[in-house]
A protein has these predicted regions:
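Acidic, mature catalytic/reactive cores of soluble proteins
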Residues: 2-4, 9, 45, 182, ...
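Active-site-adjacent substrate/metal-binding segments within catalytic domains
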Residues: 17-19, 30-32, 54, 111
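Short, acidic/polar
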Residues: 32-43, 290-300
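Catalytic domains of carbohydrate-active enzymes, especially glycoside hydrolases
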Residues: 35-60, 304-305
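Conserved, mostly hydrophobic/aromatic
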Residues: 44, 54, 162, 221, ...
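Conserved, well-ordered alpha-helix/loop/beta-strand core segments that scaffold catalytic motifs
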Residues: 203, 207-236
């Protein structure tokens, strides 16, 4: 792989493990950013490995998929370390008396979300209790870090209002809200912020906890010579803060409904293709804004990781646009995307070689390969695919190109 972001290190080989934090061992239903994560980093170091790859770390929405987050920026509150909150005296042992008996084989996310959300809200109430004099209340450095996070995270206000708005509407998607919040004017937005101020504070608090814990963990890994490989989906969920707050950047009608949605055409694996349903980008508008939203997204993600895998890389070259309302992906069409222009702008803005891994699996044509190679981005090789048609198979190790990542 190419050199790390912002460093002058020569390219070297990286070897590691792909393991999402939720799969780490721990006592609270799923893995967290606590002791289990630190032990895993120690294990990587002892094993002579230098890379930890994770799935997208976003705040998951419907279906609990990391590839359908509520936000391109917000982190997953379910992996906040509850033991860390004990250390901050925001939670106590007696708060865990009614903890469910977790199934070691399968996660009941409904039960998990109810349990952890209750504890996070309890921690938030204590965070604002000035009568407490221990833990975080006796740590000016932690309080300053919280204030700095809230001041510098330009995405945080919209995220907090969006999530508080969803709670206010019992989880209803934003495109079914009343007009003064679905497409609010500046004044209407200010009114809702005042109305939902306390609820918004909770979401800012949990995002600070996630960011603080994850960046502390990342520093621990980096200090031991372990690089973090992050991951993001190319498209955003329809019911996400990014679509709600930036409707002109997506192909939506006047009511907030997509005119076309994402997917892939029919192929060897599916006679009807794949209908993902994500709203597609209005690339003309992104180009007019200098790709500001995308640049902010990539820049922020690179504070959380050293390399970044982007799912469905081919969508930067051409994307499959399916008319909204179709039941399959058959009636879509390929539409050009501004791949070269976009990555040129991204590279110029970052000021160094892009530390991006291109997920280039599936039906890939020459123009996708040219885009990938023009910017020196490593593609992916999957050994599991190596033994179909072994005479001519790019996934066999002796056929690998030099700049690639093998799984």
């Amino acid at each position: 792989m190419a050199e790390e972001a912002g460093t002058s290190k020569k390219p070297k080989k990286y070897t590691g493990i792909l393991l999402h934090p939720t799969s780490l061992p721990g006592p609270y239903g799923i893995g967290e950013l606590g002791a289990g994560a630190y032990r895993f980093i120690d294990f990587l170091e002892r094993s002579g490995l230098n890379t930890w790859q994770v799935l997208p770390l976003g705040h998951t929405g419907f279906g609990d998929s990391p590839y359908q987050p509520f936000s391109a920026f917000a982190g997953q509150p379910l992996i906040i370390s509850l033991d860390h909150l004990k250390e901050l005296h925001l939670l106590y042992d007696e708060d865990f008396r009614d903890m469910p008996a977790w199934n070691a084989e399968q996660i009941n996310y409904g039960e998990l979300i109810e349990f952890k959300t209750g504890l996070l809200k309890l921690a938030y109430s204590r965070f604002h209790d000035e009568s407490l004099s221990d833990g975080i209340h006796d740590d000016p450095e932690m309080k300053q870090a919280y204030d700095n996070f809230c001041e510098t995270s330009v995405w945080l206000e919209d995220y907090a209002l969006f999530m508080a708005g969803k709670d206010y509407h019992q989880g209803m998607p934003w495109y079914m809200w009343e007009d003064n919040l679905k497409k609010p004017t500046k004044k209407q937005k200010e009114t809702w912020v005042k109305k939902l101020d306390t609820e918004m504070g909770y979401y800012k608090f949990i995002q600070f906890l996630f960011y603080y814990e994850w960046t502390t963990l990342k520093k621990y890994a980096n200090d031991k010579g372990i690089s973090i490989v992050g991951d993001i989906p190319i498209f955003m969920a329809w019911d996400s803060v990014d679509v709600w707050a930036n409707q002109s950047l997506f192909q939506l009608d006047s009511k907030g409904y997509p005119t076309v949605v994402a997917g892939v055409p029919p192929d060897y694996f599916s006679a009807t293709g794949q209908l993902w349903g994500n709203p597609l980008y209005n690339w003309k508008k992104h180009t007019e804004t200098g790709y500001e939203w995308w640049l902010n997204r990539i820049r922020y993600q690179l504070t959380l990781c050293d390399f970044l895998r982007i799912d469905h890389f081919r969508g930067f070259d051409k994307y499959w646009a399916i008319p909204y309302g179709e039941e399959t992906a058959i009636n879509g069409k390929w539409v050009e995307a501004p791949g070269v222009n976009f990555f040129t702008q991204l590279e110029a803005t970052l000021g160094y070689h892009l530390p991006i891994i291109a997920e280039d699996l599936g039906e890939i044509d020459d123009s996708v390969i040219e885009l990938r190679d023009k910017f020196g981005l490593p593609g992916m090789k999957v050994l599991q695919f190596a033994f179909e048609n072994p005479e001519e198979n790019d996934f066999l190790p002796h056929n690998f190109v030099r700049n690639c990542v093998c799984y």
